[in-house]
């Protein structure tokens, strides 16, 4: 799964971009605690462990 696909799912869940430094984008949710960081590296797939961490942080 690419970062673009992950961001699409997160945006549908209500997450929005709050900061970006280089290729790392941070997102925040209006009601869920914390932030989620997604590394956007073109069309490369996100490694499975990183993807699981993103879903866990996002509460999905």
Model-derived features with residue positions:
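Minor-groove-contacting beta-hairpin "wing" of winged helix-turn-helix DNA-binding domains
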Residues: 24-28
